C-alpha cells in the first residue's frame, strides 16, 4: 500500500479535498486493486485508538467502581473534537438562517417606492452569494470531520470488544448468542459512522428554531406560531408513522426468518430437493410465506412513503397557515411573503428531518453504548498463578460444573432486584433456562502423573473427558478439590482448528522459528508430502477454517502446532480422529512415543492400543472415575469390562463413533452388573432435560422402544438451547461425525468430522445453514471448524494424506525441545498490511461486476412488471401538467399586465400556486385570488399523491416478481451450476439483496424521482421567467452528469473493496471464537489482537478513502451549483425589465435548487448502488434451467435427438421391473471440469442387489449422483429399455428411491416432510410409518403428523431421520433404490430396522448399495468394484473372492469370510417372507449379534 497523500497535504488541499484526486483518476481509468488503496493515517491506527479508549475505560472502572459508564470514557477521548465540529456545523446552519434576510432586502429594492435601495442590490446579491460560498467551505470539512470521528469511535470500540472476548470466561460464552455478538459489532457500531454527523442537530435544531421563530416574528408577528404548530403536528404524525412502521416490521421479521430458514435449508440440501423432485413443492411453501411477508412489507413501505412525502408536501401548508391569516388582517408585501417562504424552507428541514434524525441517532447510539457497556462488565477468564518449578501433574478430589451454583443464582437475583435497570444478557438467559439442580460434569476426580508419563483418558459418550482437559487449562473452574501443575501447557483441540494464514503460521503460531524443531514436527506429523504438493509449500495461505484442506490435513496441522510449542504438559483431545488406521499408528509412534517421550502427555482416546501403551489409564463414566491405574490393573480389577473390549474383534479398526457406542454400552452393562451403577445412576438422574425435549414419558417409552440411539441417549442440552454448527472436512479422507445435541459435558464427544463431497453429491453430508436457532459462542467453539457458508472444494483439488514412512526419531539423540524459544518470540508481525495474504485468506468467488450499474439493468428492472412502465409514464404526465400549469399561471399574470412578481414554494407541485398567489397581492383584490390559490394548491397536492403512492406500490410488486423468478431459477438450475457457487452467496441474494429491493430501493427511487422533478421543474420555471439563465443551466447540467459519471466509477469500486475488507474482521472474530481455548492455552492473545487490528486497519483504509472521495464529489457539486446561483442572481438583478415578483420567484427557486440538489445527488448515487443488488439478482434469474446443457449437447452431437421430447411408449407404470443398463457413462462435476467417472458400462437385472466397492474417493457416490442425472454426463442409461434422453428429468428421478447418508429434513410438519405434495392420505402415511418403526415416536408428539419440525429436525436422532427417508422411498413406490452409506451414523438398532425393511419391503426392487459395513452388504448378489474412475470388476462374490482383486484390499480376512458365509446362505432356497409385524423381534435378535 502507498502512503496516504493526506499526511503530506497542505491546508488548502485538505479544505477542498484535493488529495484524493490520484485515486479518482486511477479508478476512472482502470480497475482498482487492494494494493492501490492508501495506508491509513497514523491517527486512525487501531492500536493507537484502542489503547487510548482502553486506558480511559480502565480509568473509569477505577474511579467509578459502583457505576462505571462507557460514555464517560468516550467523552474523555473524543469530546473536544466532537464539540469543535459541532460549532462549525452550527455556523453553517446559521448562514442558512441569514440568507432570507438578504433575499428580502433584494426584493424590496425592486419596489417602485424604494428606488434608492436599487443601487445596493448588487452588494446585497454579493453578500447572499458569499453566504453560499462560506456555507460550502465550512459544511464539508465539518461533516467529514464528524464522519471521521465516528469512524475512530467505531474502531476503538471494535478493538475493546475483541479484547474483552479474548478474556471472557467459558461459562459466560455459553450464554452469549453468536449472532447477537456479531450484530453488536456490525449493526450497532455502524451507527457511529453516519450517526455522529447528525448528532449535533439535537441541540442545533432547537437553537435554529428559536432563531428562525424570532426572524419570522419580525415579519408576521404572532401568526408565526400557526406554521410552527403545523410543523410540530407533522413531526408527531411522523413519529406515529414510525411507531406503526416498527410494529409492522416486527411482525414481518418472524415471516422473514421463517422464509430464510426454509430457503437456507433448501439451498444447502438442493441436491436432495432435486432427487425427490420437490422443486415445485418447495417453491410453493416459500411463496406462501412470501405472500404474507409482502403484505406487511407494503404496509411498512406505505408508512415510510407518507413520512417521506409529508416533508415534500408540507411546504404549502406551512406558508399558507402563516401568511393567509396575516394577510386578512394586515397589509402584506411581497418581500414578507418570499422572506417567510425562505425561512419556512429552512424551518421545515430542521423540524421534520434534522431533529428527528438526531433524536433517533442518540437513541440508537446510547442504546449501543449500553449494550457494549453491559458486555464489558461480564465475567472474565481468571488467570491462575502456577508454580513453574512443579514437575508433576496432580488432581485431588476435583468436582466441577459448567452450570452456575445456587449461591451465584441468589446473588444474581439480588443484583437484578436492586438495580432494575436494563436487562442484562446474562440475567435474561440465566432465568429463562433456570435449573434447581447443579449438575457436576466431573465429580471426585483424582490422579497423579510424574514427568514424562502418558495418561490415556477414555470413557462413555458425554462422560466429561474434554471437560477434564478444560479444567486443567483453567477454562472450567473446579468447585471442589485442587489441581497442581506448572501451567506451561500445549493443547490440541478435539475439532481441528485452523486460523487464516500460511501453513507455517498455523504451526509456529507466533513463536520464534526454529528450523530443526519445525522440520522434526512436520515430519513426525506426516505433513512433509502434503506441503510439497502445494505450489507455495508451507507458505501456502489457508482460508478461514482451512476450507481447502481435508479433515486429516487439518488434524495433523493442529497436532503439529501443539508439538511445536515447548511445554511441560501436552493435552491432546482425540487428535487422531480424522486419520485412517495406518497413518494414526505411525503418527502415534513418531509423536507421542518418540518425539514427546520425555514430556507429560494426557491423551483422550477410545483405542485399546493407546490404552495398552499408556503409563496410566483414566476411565470416566457419567462424570465419575470408573477406573484409574495401568492396563494390567484394569484387567485385574475390571475383568468384565476388559474382557468385553478385548473380545471385540478389530475394535480399533471401527470408526470412532462406533467405538464410543461400544464403550458407552459396555460401561452401562458393567456398571449395572458390578453394582457400581447405584452411585452413577443416582447421579445420572440429576441431569437436566432439554428445553425443547418431549415430555418425560416420551423418554421412558423410548427406553423400551426399538428406536434407541445409544450415542445420543446420554447427551445433555446446555443451559441455553443452542444451534449446532457442525464440524466439516473436505477431501478424500474418511471422517464421520454425529451432529447431535450438546453433550452432558458441553463438549462434543463425537470424535470424527463429517465428510464433504462436491455439492452435486447428494449422498455426502452438507450441513444446513442455521437460520434462526440460537447458537452460543461455546457451541461454536466445540462443534465447528469451518463456517456453515463454506466453499465446497472439488474432490480433485484435495489430495489424500501422506502415507510415506517417516524418520526414525529413536535414532536421533537430539531433543527438539532442548533450546527453549521465546514465548513472544522473534516472529514479528509486520505493521504493514499484507493485503495479498488477507485477500487469499478470505478469497471470495464473487464474479466481477461492472463498475457502475448498466442501463440494461435499469431497463430490465423497469420492464419486469409492465405496471411500472405505466406508473412512470403517469409520473411524467403529472410532472408536465404541473410545469404547464405553472407556465400558464405566469402567462395569465403577464396577460393581466399587473406589474407584480410571483412567489414559489420549494416543490414543483406548488410552482403555479406561487405564481397566482404573488399576482393576487395588490391593493384591492384579496379574496378571489386566495380562493384560486387554495383550489390550485389542493388539486396539485392530490396529483402529487397520485404520483408517489402508485410508484412505491408498484416497486414492491416488482420486488415480489424478482424474488419469485430468482427462486424458480435457483430451484430449477442444474447441479453443475451449484458446484461453482457458494451456498452462502446464493443465500445472500435471498437475504441481503432481497431486503434491499424490498425496503430500501422503493423509497430511495421515490425520493430520487421526487427530488429530480423538483430541481428540473424549478429550472424550467426560472428559465421561462429569465431565458438568460439557460446560459448557466445547460453547462451546469453537463458538468453535473460528467462529474457523477467520473465519481461513480471509483466510488463503486471503493465501496466493493470496503465490503470485501469487512469480511476479514468478522471472519477473524469467528475464527478467534472457535480457537479461543487454543489461543489461551498458547498465550497468544496479544498475537491475535495484532492480527485483528491489521484486519481493522485494512477496512479503515478502504472506508476512509471512500468517505474522502465522496466528500470530494459532494463539495464539487456544491461549488458548481453555487456558481450557478451566482450567475442566476446577477442575471436577474442585471435585467432591468423585471419586477419584484419575478426576482422573488427566480431567487427563491435558485436557492431551493441549491439546497435540494445535494440531496438529489446523494439519492442518485444510492439508487445506483442499490441497483447492483438488482443486477446480482438478475444473474441468478439467468441461471439456465436444468437439462438445458445436456439437451444442447445431445442436439449438437445428434440432430435427430431434437425431435425426441418424450417417449411415446412410456407407460404410467414405468419402470415396472427395474432393469438398468449403463453404457459408456462419463460424469463431470462441471461441464468444463475433468471426468470423475470415465466410460462406465454395466447392466443390472431387475430385482438384483448390487454392492459398490472401492477406496474412499474412488467414485462410488459420484456414480449414484450420475445415475440421478445430477452431474454433467455423457453416455446412455436405460431403465426397462427406456433411455434417459427420452424421459424428462422429473420422470427419470421419480423412478429412483434414495436413502442418502444425510437426510434432508426441512422446517415443517412431519406430514409435509414425508409427503410435501400431499398425495397420500393420513391412513397411508400412518401405515408406512408403522412399517418403518416411526409411528410410536410420532404419536408421542403433541400434534402427531402435524407437529412442526424446525432447524433440520434437530430434536430427532439420526436414526429417526434415516427412517423418515426410508418412509419417503416406500411412499414413492420406486423400483430402483439407491443407498449411499445410509448406516454410517446409525446405532445398531436403527441399522437392523433399515436392513430388515430393505429385505422385505423392497424385495422386488433393484438395489444399488454403497456401504462400508460388512453386515449391510450381506444381501448383495453382485459387486461393482470402482478404481481409477472406471469399472475395475463387476462379478459375483465367488469370483471376487477367488481372484487377487481390489476386493481383498477393501475388506479384511474376517469380513470376507463373513460375506462368503452369508452369500452361501443367500444362494440357497429363499425363506418364506416373514410378516412385517415380526420386524421388531428379528431386529432385537440381530442386535445382540451386531452390537459388539
Curated annotation (Swiss-Prot):
One of the protein's GO biological processes: multicellular organismal-level water homeostasis
Residue intervals on the Extracellular side: 100-123, 218-223, 321-340, 889-932, 1026-1027, 1131-1144
MF terms in GO: ABC-type transporter activity; ATP binding; ATP hydrolysis activity; bicarbonate transmembrane transporter activity; chloride channel activity; chloride transmembrane transporter activity; intracellularly ATP-gated chloride channel activity
Tagged with keyword DNA damage: no
Disordered R region, as annotated region: 655-840
EC supergroup of this enzyme: isomerase
PROSITE patterns per UniProt: ABC_TM1F, ABC_TRANSPORTER_1, ABC_TRANSPORTER_2
Keyword match Acetylation: no
Glycosylation, residue list: 905, 923
Main subcellular location of this protein, as a coarse class: membrane
Subcellular location(s) per record: Apical cell membrane; Early endosome membrane; Cell membrane; Recycling endosome membrane
Domain (ABC transmembrane type-1): residue spans on this chain: 82-366, 868-1169
GO cellular component: apical plasma membrane; chloride channel complex; cytosol; early endosome membrane; endoplasmic reticulum membrane; membrane; plasma membrane; recycling endosome membrane
Enzyme nomenclature, EC number: 5.6.1.6
Topological type in the membrane: Multi-pass membrane protein
Binding site for ATP 2: 1229, 1254-1261
Entry's family note: Belongs to the ABC transporter superfamily. ABCC family. CFTR transporter (TC 3.A.1.202) subfamily.
Name of the protein in question: Cystic fibrosis transmembrane conductance regulator
Species this protein is from: Squalus acanthias
Top-level taxonomy: Eukaryota, Metazoa, Chordata, Craniata, Vertebrata
Protein's gene: CFTR
